[in-house]
Every structure is written in structure tokens, then in C-alpha cells.
Amino acid sequence: MHEKRLTDIQRALAIDKVVNYIAENLGNYPFSKITVAQADYERNPLYGLSQLPRFISPFESDFLFEIKFLKTYLNNYLHTILKLDPRKDNWIYDGIQIYWMIKYMETFYPETKMMGNVAQLKLFKGYNIVSADFNDQYSYLYLLMARKNLDQPLSNPKNTLIRFNDKIASKYKAGLILNYLDSYIGNDYMAKSIQDFIILN
């Protein structure tokens, strides 16, 4: 993955931070190497961040690289170590990925807003969306489909989902469900359950 405005040292620090966080929470990657390419990210981008034009940069370059790398690394990590049916059980991959992305943001960037630096501009101060936390974007994008009555069950096979649900809404819904269960049960039970699930599969 590349971010032209970052030095090699900044990239290495971001990669190290993400890899250590995932190893600490999901376990060490069992193989000697993992490939994380720009093409992987482009196939499965973080919607919201990737749709903004280059001249509007509400987030710092190092933050953008870190979040993009986190999403892509988690995706490749989970698809390599979990032996699930990618058609029927795709929501499990997506749910674990989004759940740990939410936890990562809560751990390292709890004050980051969904609109980034735009939240500091006086012109936008009166809008609720500007004050929304970064993790609120998952529920906003999921609810976009739910309010249009186009929500589909997570148990539906991947090939039966409409495009928006396949690419965005179902992924975010799965992650939000795991995060909700974590909040409801407490005691890091969900994190431990995910670790056990990965070990068993």
C-alpha cells in the first residue's frame, strides 16, 4: 500500500502499530509472510474515506494510511486463517473485521470525528453530522439501507445481496451487532469469544 505524502519511517510505524494490535487481540499471524497490496484495498475500501476528492483532506495522511492498512490487513489476515465458506459465512469475516476496526478507533483515536478536520470549521458547527464520532459512520451507512427497507439478513448468501449491502451495509451491520453484544455482555467477553473462534477454526 502506498501514501505518497508519507515517509518510509511513518509507514513502518503505522504498519508496526497495526500488526502489534492485531497480534495482541487476535493472535500472531501463523505464517511467515502476509501480503497487503493497494489492489486489496481498492477491492474492499473503507467507504466514506475513499470517496472524498484528494483536495479535501479532512484527515492527516498518516491517519488515512493507518486506517486503510488496518482494514486491508484485517481482511487478508482473517481470510487466510479462517476456513469458512466465503459465500455463506462472509458476514463472519466482515463482522470480525469491522468490530476490531471499531475497537482500534476507540483505543487509539477516541476523539476523532467522522468528518475529521471539517468539524473544526465554523461554517459547519451547527450540523449534527460534524460532531459525530468516527465510528458512527458504520451505523449511518447501515441505516441508509434499513430506512429504505432494503436491508437483507446477514444469513443470506453473498451472491444474493444487492450491491450496496454486499459492499457496505451488511459488513457494517455485522460489525455493529458484535460491538452491541460486546457492550451488552461486557467484560471483554466478545473479544475473548472471537479469539476462541479463530483458534477453533
Tell where the protein language model's regions lie, with residue ranges:
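Juxtacatalytic substrate-recognition/specificity segment
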Residues: 1-89, 96, 100, 162-163
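Glycine-rich, acidic and aromatic/proline-enriched surface loops and short helix-turn segments
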Residues: 24-28, 41-46, 139-150, 174, ...
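A generic secondary-structure signal for well-formed alpha-helical elements
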Residues: 26-30, 76-81, 85, 100-112, ...
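Short coil/turn segments at secondary-structure boundaries
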Residues: 33-37, 116-117, 192-195
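An acidic- and aromatic-residue-enriched active-site/binding cleft used to recognize and process polar
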Residues: 39-41, 102, 132, 195
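Single, functionally critical "micro-switch" positions that shape active/binding sites
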Residues: 70, 74, 93, 114-115, ...
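Acidic/His/Gly-enriched intrinsically disordered linker/tail segments
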Residues: 88, 92-176
